[in-house]
Amino acid sequence: MRYLATLLLSLAVLITAGCGWHLRDTTQVPSTMKVMILDSGDPNGPLSRAVRNQLRLNGVELLNKETTRKDVPSLRLGKVSIAKDTASVFRNGQTAEYQMIMTVNATVLIPGRDIYPISAKVFRSFFDNPQMALAKDNEQDMIVKEMYDRAAEQLIRKLPSIRAADIRSDEEQTSTTTDTPATPARVSTTLGN
């Protein structure tokens, strides 16, 4: 009986490992991006902390921005904007529900290659109860923090597509160099949205 249980457990492990199953909230970061520089205008801000946390969860080693290594990819966090749109109103015309939209822009610089812009958008609903002002502010702060975490997850999930775009542009570059003697300048493509 014990042998059968061990055999079934081993079989279950092999099947899940063989089919590409992985833990939730983890991304297969390309091996060329396992060591990276995180560059941000606000290194201790909520987005920087969320991205740093997601990179570490996915096994990426972060180097200092001031490092002398120039062969390491760099993730540069750009502008973050949060917009609030009215989703519904009460009978008296006051706003009952907001839809909050967070847009995050970033770029990945691969040395000797190209700069790849990426972006992430996160949507959340927020109920506005005018009778509970303090609770409303606390809830809004929690929602914004969660939005930063989701935006960081989306940015990290786009790293494999950057690697694929880099490989594709290399293939296009080699095919154009063999077909024609003169090659046009490389144009980066926008990933996401």
UniProtKB/Swiss-Prot annotation:
Keywords: Cell outer membrane, Lipoprotein, Membrane, Palmitate, Signal
One Gene Ontology cellular component: transporter complex
Cited Pfam families: LptE
GO MF annotation terms: lipopolysaccharide binding
UniProt-annotated location(s): Cell outer membrane
Xref: InterPro entries: LPS_assembly_LptE
Lipid-substituted positions (N-palmitoyl cysteine): 19
Functional note: Together with LptD, is involved in the assembly of lipopolysaccharide (LPS) at the surface of the outer membrane. Required for the proper assembly of LptD. Binds LPS and may serve as the LPS recognition site at the outer membrane.
Subunit structure: Component of the lipopolysaccharide transport and assembly complex. Interacts with LptD.
Family membership noted in the UniProt record: Belongs to the LptE lipoprotein family.
Name by which UniProt lists this protein: LPS-assembly lipoprotein LptE
Species this protein is from: Escherichia fergusonii (strain ATCC 35469 / DSM 13698 / CCUG 18766 / IAM 14443 / JCM 21226 / LMG 7866 / NBRC 102419 / NCTC 12128 / CDC 0568-73)
